[in-house]
């Protein structure tokens, strides 16, 4: 059990890869801090494994990320699963959607890593 008692933050943990990863880390004995913007699905995740700590977090919000991460001492691992994809032709992507993509895919990774 190499992950036993390791403190791991998993972003986008409410569904998909983030959820599967959070559950797998918890099963291996890690202390998992699961974040997502979808609080309802985070609550479902907590019901699946009571050892997972959940927190509603917009990982593109600098002050929220800073406050949250500073509340956890000695983080061992960050598993950043947040992602946003524009589906369709790039010519149909407006500047707001492009900015959202940059914020979610790049800026949030920068904030969480700091």
Predicted feature locations:
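Flexible N-terminal pre-Rossmann segment of NAD(P)-dependent oxidoreductases
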Residues: 1-9
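Conserved glycine-rich cofactor-binding loop
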Residues: 14-15
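Conserved glycine-rich Rossmann-like NAD(P)H-binding loop of the short-chain dehydrogenase/reductase
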Residues: 28-42
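Rossmann-fold cofactor-recognition segment
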Residues: 49-62
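Conserved NAD(P)H cofactor-binding loop of Rossmann-fold oxidoreductase domains
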Residues: 82-87
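Substrate-binding pocket helix/loop in short-chain dehydrogenase/reductase
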Residues: 89-90, 97-99
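A short, exposed helix-loop element centered on a Lys and neighboring polar residues
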Residues: 113-114
